[in-house]
Amino acid sequence: MDQGMADELARLAPLLSGRIGRTIVLVGLMGAGKSCVGRRLAARLGLDFVDSDAEFEAASGSSISDYFARFGEAAFREGERKVIARLLDGPPVVLATGGGAFVDPTTRERIKAAGTSVWIRADLELLLKRTVGRDHRPLLKQGDPREILGRLMEARYPIYAEADIIVESTDEVPEATVIRVMEGLITYLDLEKTV
């Protein structure tokens, strides 16, 4: 991270200080950078970072891959729904969700009611670069990753577009995306205050 980026992060953080009254929920496809960006964003905002997948694994006592294999996607989504609802009932945090969480209508409505959603959008090539060869991506084990991600983008991007804030994730340092999220939050909170 260069000095200009560090200065911009330092400038933006006070503009959000004391203004975060709801959980910031990061949504998007696997590999978009939700966890990486979320950790850095939480540190800048003085909030805890929570990964809904890690919370699911802790609650179920099983990895998501194993849970998927044993019980299927429908059972996983039901458990994920409960975990996210519990997290939204707590104090504000930065919450990174699994790629399919926001697609679930019940989860999406709960996020809209109790959180501020941020879609971290990335193009196919970047998603492939970040996900191929990782063992913890059960959906990518079902065929050609390019084809699977392309189908997921086609099906999910129109739903992700319902998020309160949309930012691009590019192949640059994560802090660049953190800056875009912080700018989006400032604009969103300013607009929310005037409505």
From Swiss-Prot:
Record-annotated residues binding Mg(2+)? S35
Q: Which UniProt keywords apply?
A: Amino-acid biosynthesis, Aromatic amino acid biosynthesis, ATP-binding, Cytoplasm, Kinase, Magnesium, Metal-binding, Nucleotide-binding, Transferase
Which pathway does the protein contribute to? Metabolic intermediate biosynthesis; chorismate biosynthesis; chorismate from D-erythrose 4-phosphate and phosphoenolpyruvate: step 5/7
Q: Which GO terms describe its cellular component?
A: cytosol
Q: What class of enzyme is it?
A: transferase
> Which residues are involved in binding ATP?
G31, A32, G33, K34, S35, C36, R137
Biological process terms in GO annotation: amino acid biosynthetic process; aromatic amino acid family biosynthetic process; chorismate biosynthetic process
Q: Where found?
A: Cytoplasm
Primary localization class, coarse: cytoplasm
Q: Which GO terms describe its molecular function?
A: ATP binding; magnesium ion binding; shikimate kinase activity
Show the catalytic activity: shikimate + ATP = 3-phosphoshikimate + ADP + H(+)
As for what it does, the entry says: Catalyzes the specific phosphorylation of the 3-hydroxyl group of shikimic acid using ATP as a cosubstrate.
Record's protein name: Shikimate kinase
Give the source species: Paramagnetospirillum magneticum (strain ATCC 700264 / AMB-1) (Magnetospirillum magneticum)
Instruction: List the taxonomic lineage.
Output: Bacteria, Pseudomonadati, Pseudomonadota, Alphaproteobacteria, Rhodospirillales
